[in-house]
Amino acid sequence: MLREAIRSGTPLGREVKQIIEGGGLIDDGVMTQLVTDRLGQPDAAAGFWLDGYPRTIPQAQCLDEFMQGRPPLVVVDIALSDAEVLHRLASRLVCEECGTNAQDTGADPRCHSCGGRLVPRVDDADTIVRNRLTVYRRQTAPLIEYYSGRPAFHQVNGAQLPDDVTLEIIRAIEATRAAGSSA
């Protein structure tokens, strides 16, 4: 959603771009408005995936309010050490044309989706990532406690192979649906 806002070129998109490139986080009000607007669209009625939201307790509370009367919210925390985060992001690339993310494998630096040039993401510079990790520990880590007592909260080991992480997430979603629990 943030990348879409940036690509839109609107004043809000330009503001979002400046904040992200500086390693900051979007304030709760703007972020919640972006998310609830998107989740209110018809294609989200069958289900949705939020990556990186909520990031703060107030955002989580707004999401809880939005979810009233809807199917249970499954919350998955993908646990990963700071060292592994830094390692992975150091090799992450993005297509200049279509925005597709890719890993630097040393092969042809062209996007597999559109053929565009792959470049390092501005917001993945080491100092920016370290700043984001500091902000994460201060603002986002408390969400683990906020959600941990709920039956639909699951923690997944993010250091596994991507397919194994995905499988564990799918199992968590299926287990929550089977139990009919609510977050």
Label the model's feature ranges:
Residues 4, 15, 59, 77, ...:
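Residue-level recognition of specific faces of alpha-helices
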Residues 1-70, 81-87, 121:
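ATP-dependent small-molecule kinase phosphotransfer cores
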Residues 120-183:
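NTP-dependent small-molecule kinase module
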Residues 51, 69-93, 102-113, 119, ...:
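Conserved phosphate-donor/acceptor-positioning beta-strand/loop module used by diverse small-molecule
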Residues 1-2, 82, 102, 160-162:
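Residue-level detector of flexible, active-site-proximal loop/helix-junction positions
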Residues 8-13, 108-114:
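Short, flexible, mixed-charge acidic loops at enzyme active sites
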Residues 21, 39-40, 68, 90, ...:
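Signal for well-folded cores of large energy- and translation-related assemblies
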